[in-house]
Amino acid sequence: ERVVQRRVDLLASDGVTFKTSTEIGRDVSAKQLMDDFDAVVLCVGATKPNDFFAKTAGRDLTGIHFAMEFLTKNTKSLLDSRHEDGQYIDAAGKDVIVIGGGDTGTDCIGTSLRHGCNSLVTFEIVPQSPNERAPNNPWPQWPRIMRVDYGHQEAAAKFDYSRVKGKQLS
């Protein structure tokens, strides 16, 4: 919390204005934002899941969880009781599949590994990124390239993916 507040304070001292818990269209209009600021960055968060598989057979089976439910319960239980309260979704000894990527998917991978999952597979719905920047992705744009994040590195080390032919970390 202290680290995040320090960064917020640094950005604010550089002239960044933060408007939190604000619904565009209810609390402020998009036009007003565009009129009042040179640049607008919308950080909407990901706490409400998009259930892509709502109509898939078996979606309601026990053991299927949304990422933020898994991560939030884990963090709260860890901070409150070092997991002694049992109020978290335990991946220990389980065969885990993480569907989705980005920071949230990587955090789910890392958390599952730290719990001691039996196995772990991760899927993303986007094609694999190239190893090098494409001509239509020049600097200073964010590089859309293949990365191996900390969770993938931990999974590769634990399960020795380097020895499994055809396995690919993404």
Regions found by a protein language model. Give the residues of each.
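Residues forming the flavin
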Residues: 1-170
